């Protein structure tokens, strides 16, 4: 019985050995069908994406843990779309998966991973193209959606540290205040004029990032926006009231951030379009290289089976 098992085990070992040698065995002409240039180009290119995606993923998870969002996720489910770290997590995860499948597929010459890699890139390319067409066709609805989203961002300014940092950076960079103007901050519970009833120090004010030259100061004055939107008392003399309004108005940015965003997009439309085209070209090249490598691997396997 033992003698019968030995030939079977021997043949099984030989079969495993031969399969493991497919990618190393030269063809009938003594040369491999697999291009080392294509193989290691795909691998090197995707190592960058793998590391970039892994870094974004780690940073996003760390940011969520720092805010205890994972613990309170269900209670804050309605406001998850306002959390700026979620797009970071999604982009990081997709980049990580693409880079990982590309690295494994090219280095191990695994056709399944290369097929998954090409399919994922293709689906992503289709999604990007569809999103671009949809954004152009429904630009009016998209403008209203962005406006409503920014209004929600103003309302939730104090609810999320990352969201607060994002808004402050935007207002300081573009030298703007609110969505359409400084009065938009009246929608926020802390900055609304009605907050005077609870003696809020921020009532009728704006965030410090609305203050002119706030980003140039060595030490930020976080109280510079307090009460700048409060109307003068009725008993105050007209000229004093006018001076107070002018002084407060001169200390903050009065233009909204949405017009600034629209102006930036109009001035940099060519740059945005070129960036999108470059990203699409990189994806197409990734698909072509992966399919080329897959064809080489299949050709090498066919040649090896034919000669053995």
From Swiss-Prot:
SUPFAM superfamilies: Tetraspanin. Glycans are attached at residue 213. Expressed in the germline. GO terms for biological process: nematode male tail tip morphogenesis; positive regulation of egg-laying behavior; positive regulation of embryonic development; positive regulation of transforming growth factor beta receptor signaling pathway; positive regulation of vulval development; protein localization to plasma membrane; regulation of mesodermal cell fate specification. It comes from the Eukaryota. Residues 1-41, 108-112, 290-308 are cytoplasmic. The keyword Repeat does not apply. The chain crosses the membrane at residues 42-62, 87-107, 113-133, 269-289. It is found in: Cell membrane; Cytoplasmic vesicle membrane; Endosome membrane; Early endosome membrane. GO terms for cellular component: cytoplasmic vesicle membrane; early endosome membrane; Golgi apparatus; late endosome membrane; plasma membrane; recycling endosome membrane. Keywords: Cell membrane, Cytoplasmic vesicle, Endosome, Glycoprotein, Golgi apparatus, Membrane, Transmembrane, Transmembrane helix. It is a multi-pass membrane protein. Belongs to the tetraspanin (TM4SF) family. PANTHER family: TETRASPANIN, TETRASPANIN 26A, ISOFORM B-RELATED. This is Tetraspanin-12. It comes from Caenorhabditis elegans.
